[in-house]
Regions:
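PLD/PLD-like phosphodiesterase catalytic module centered on the HKD motif
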Residues: 1-218
Length: 218
């Protein structure tokens, strides 16, 4: 069907819409690329992508994620194993018994998931990276961009009250192009006030903050 075939609204809000079933899942099922900036990332959140994408592996869908540098200890340890070549090779693709996480490891091994870390490097930014944008692309090069939600959960039971503003390449081309440019500049580490690193580089160089005491509900 493609993204243009979805009956998209300009805004989705928790009191009026089921944001997961009306927006996220239709877009995920009809895209071949998904770019996303989120405040923080958990292994539970990332593993849901292997389920949320309809035919993720078959369609070779690409996922690029940029997140902040704070993690739970358990999440960071498991993400390191999933993204580290030395771990995945030693376990020969059978690192995790959990089915969802095993699927995640498979698509990471296939090169379908890339993860980068954004860390503020300016006195003007006091805390952490918290930009919230997302971009879907389909096979016809149509694009849907959105802003507003901080979570990447596809459970209707665990979401916050939130709203999502939506822009499409066929109705709001200039704004979509601006969001695409913003993401690409972040991805290429060309954005002022933040430095962006590959996940494994950040982990190996002790740039990530983690603690079992942090409460990061996702």
């Amino acid at each position: 069907m493609g993204l243009r075939g979805i009956n998209l609204k300009e805004e989705y809000r928790s009191d009026r819409n089921n944001i997961v079933s009306e927006f996220f899942l239709p877009c995920l099922s009809n895209c071949i690329e998904y770019d996303r900036c989120v405040d923080f990332l958990s292994i539970q959140t990332l593993s849901t992508f292997s389920i949320a994408f309809d035919g993720f592996a078959e369609r070779k869908t690409k996922l690029r994620l940029i997140t902040g540098h704070r993690f739970r200890t358990a999440d960071l340890n498991l993400l390191t194993k999933i993204f580290s070549e030395k771990y995945t090779k030693s376990f020969k693709g059978k690192l995790i018994k959990d089915a969802k996480i095993q699927k995640l490891q498979d698509i990471v091994n296939n090169g379908q998931v890339e993860l980068k870390i954004a860390i503020p490097n300016s006195e003007q930014i006091s805390d952490t990276f918290s930009e919230r944008i997302g971009i879907f692309r389909d096979e016809e090069d149509q694009t849907v961009a959105f802003t507003g939600t901080s979570k990447e959960s596809f459970s209707d039971q665990t979401r916050d009250f939130e709203s999502v503003d939506v822009f499409t390449s066929w109705n709001d081309k200039s704004r979509v192009e601006r969001k695409v440019k913003d993401f690409e500049e972040l991805w290429e580490n060309k954005t002022k006030h933040v430095k962006v690193y590959d996940f494994m580089y950040a982990e190996e160089n002790n740039l990530l903050k983690y603690s079992s005491e942090w409460i990061l509900n996702n």
